[in-house]
């Protein structure tokens, strides 16, 4: 969970998100080294009184500054492509949930069950219980079993939305008339918060997403209770 004055990302709750965090550190290290080198060269050029009469025509320098950036780009691109393919892989999901964006709430339908679905609205500030988070709590959470592949089918009823949960490394656009899909595996139990990440109107800021990952037996008990109340 994020906390005040935090500078880094949220703790990863999915293997692919852990890969994304490692890639972020990898890319940031390369950017830092390049920035340091450029700053040093600029400082040296401004402060030195020496000149090089061959500075306008140096084949060796041109070869270096052509090949070296290409190598650096490859070092960034290869791990990025690997993670991109991992994010698109959806192999034999144990549970499929349809998330539909509306102005301004989410509705969820568990397609593996005959009659399990609900709308999820933000809890108003005056109704929050002690310890709950303002603008992030919902009246109904999307409950999923932990350590199980979950597929989320994302679409929208009216305008563009985006279903995003940072801790799970998921962000998928909800486009009216189109069905997009994303997948995740919650590696630990917990409550993971997200929000609509596409500006969708006046109350865009009030479309929170709450995913609760629980052990399988707890999920079965929850689904049984929901089906009884339906």
Curated annotation (Swiss-Prot):
GO molecular function: copper ion binding; cytochrome-c oxidase activity
Topology versus the membrane: Multi-pass membrane protein
Entry protein name: Cytochrome c oxidase subunit 2
Record-listed Cu cation A1 binding positions: 161, 196, 200, 207
Compartments it resides in: Mitochondrion inner membrane
Mitochondrial matrix topological domain: 46-59
Binding of Cu cation A2, residues: 196, 198, 200, 204
Oligomer status and interactors: Component of the cytochrome c oxidase (complex IV, CIV), a multisubunit enzyme composed of 14 subunits. The complex is composed of a catalytic core of 3 subunits MT-CO1, MT-CO2 and MT-CO3, encoded in the mitochondrial DNA, and 11 supernumerary subunits COX4I, COX5A, COX5B, COX6A, COX6B, COX6C, COX7A, COX7B, COX7C, COX8 and NDUFA4, which are encoded in the nuclear genome.
Catalytic activity: 4 Fe(II)-[cytochrome c] + O2 + 8 H(+)(in) = 4 Fe(III)-[cytochrome c] + 2 H2O + 4 H(+)(out)
Organism listed in the record: Cyprinus carpio (Common carp)
